[in-house]
Amino acid sequence: ILWVQIPGLYIGYSLGTCGVVLRPFLARSKIDEEVHQRALQAFFSRDLHATKDRTGILVMASLLEHRAEILADTGINAKVPLDTWQGILNDMTGKIKSGDLTEGICTAVRECGEVLAKDFPGTHDNPNEISNKIIIED
């Protein structure tokens, strides 16, 4: 009987922790909170909050949950209205939903850059303190 129970337990556990299986059963608010928590974790674990003027920004797309998030540090939020990011998110998610992930992310990054250039122009005494590379995680 153990030879049936142990594999069954393993399969049940695996399915229960698999996002693809769980996603249809989770409330929208729970999915939003999970994505937001992962964005916060990425923001702080990559030290985006550690710039001199607190001007780090994270643009994140979570493909499994079909959600996106833009997090800006306090230096940016002091000058840029929060609803600015919602407009950019709407553009990005619209492109992603239509099947153009690359264009969605590129558009979001470009639009964020345009917003930031107004209040945070690049200068010689304000070097780029963090990497601008795109990071893809499973």
Language model regions located:
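Flexible, solvent-exposed short loops/turns enriched in glycine
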Residues: 64-101
